[in-house]
């Protein structure tokens, strides 16, 4: 598999999401969605940059949203093309097939060769136990860097928590932490995440 996709690599340092003290990094998985533009608007109003770990969508509206994310100065990351756990975790080759498809789509639509990625389900999950170490080694060899998360909005389920629950949950778990990576979802059902975002940003800033 090291011979597969010779143009599927990046050079130079990947963004370091966890090295700065007193910094909480905001990340959004599974977009773009009907809410992407609204998330971007809140982030602009609060003067905050985020990382969007996106999936593969080829409709024109989604392509435009990829471009909006980049134009607004945010980091575009890969979260797999298909988000199909059984498919992508079959083998290293299957993983590369899927992520190369997304890498190529994002490069064509935005001009960006994204260097960061996130595993669906996290880097170690019940679907990839036999293959995750090989996947990580191969992706790192190609210059990519993956990021899990340390704080979650718990908003992946179709029935999302209330905005207050999202905000209070993250702020409570952030107590005593000098840094962290916050997981949220940019999905059509995550209206309460959008509602929570302004207060969450203010609350994290108050904590320093």
Residues of each region from the PLM?
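N-terminal pre-catalytic segment of deacetylase/amide-hydrolase enzymes
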Residues: 1-26, 32-47, 61-67, 164, ...
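Residue-level preference for short coil/turn positions at secondary-structure junctions
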Residues: 19-21, 46, 72, 113, ...
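Generic beta-sheet signal
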Residues: 23-25, 50, 178-184
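Ser/Thr-centric signal marking residues that sit
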Residues: 27, 36, 51, 80, ...
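Catalytic domains of cell-wall/extracellular-matrix polysaccharide-remodeling enzymes
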Residues: 60, 83-205
